[in-house]
Amino acid sequence: RDVERSRGLGDVYKRQGTNCEYDTAHAFARAGADPEVLVIRNLTPADVTASCEALVKAINESQIVMLPGGFSGGDEPDGSAKFITAFFRNGAVKEATNKLLKVREGLMCGICNGFQAIVKLGLVPFGEIIDTDENCPTLTFNKIGRHQSRIVHTRIASNKSPWLAKTSVGDVYNVAISHGEGRFIANDSVLASLVENGQIATQYVDLSGNATMDINFNPNGSS
């Protein structure tokens, strides 16, 4: 669909242990959006309730929701992602999020654990929060079994997403990565559907621009 050129209203979700929320908000502001950094509090049950209500209000008033990365809970397996998904599975928050994406044609994006949460909520690849099961894609431990931090080469495989509207298929970008659970896995039928729908946005590639499973270029062993 065409992307509106109006001034966007962005909601950047913040919780304990987050990083990159302020530079993300700065990037949105530079692009012409009006970002708000929303702090999620969970010290008391009343704080949790108030934070859910504030999140619903912010989503309803925004065109974009951005989930930054972080190391909540010491970044234990699924640590930060579990914290994020718990909030977004709240009934009112889930309803507001699905309405943003399916009715109001809003956008979501996630960095690091934020993207991990988006996958575990079913937002990628299904476009709405669902009750996921063992057949759904997930992000898990790097195949090498440890954290990876390096520069990788990524090729644009599809520019159907509004986030990639100004790129061209075949463009290669050098991207800094740093993660321990960045391996995207999905069953064959889901992968085939992603290919058919143009939902594989980027691929790790070698120096010749070819998609590869070589650990020297594909740092986590993603499918």
Describe each PLM feature range.
Residues 2-9, 13:
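Single conserved hydrophobic/aromatic residue that forms the stacking wall/gate
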Residues 10, 84, 112-113, 154, ...:
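Conserved structural-core and active-site-/substrate-pathway-adjacent residues in large, well-folded domains
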Residues 11-26:
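Glycine-rich phosphate/diphosphate-binding loop of Rossmann-like nucleotide-binding domains
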Residues 11-14, 37-39, 66, 109-110, ...:
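Structured core elements
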Residues 15-18, 42, 71-72, 180-182, ...:
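Short, glycine-/Ser/Thr-/acidic-enriched flexible segments
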Residues 20-23, 75-76, 118-120, 164-165, ...:
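Short helix/loop capping segments that flank catalytic or ligand/cofactor-binding pockets
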Residues 27-31, 35-109, 115-129, 133-134:
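Flexible gly/pro-rich beta->alpha loop and the following alpha-helix that scaffold active-site loops
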Residues 29, 34, 50, 54-57, ...:
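Amide-donor transfer/coupling interface in amidating biosynthetic enzymes
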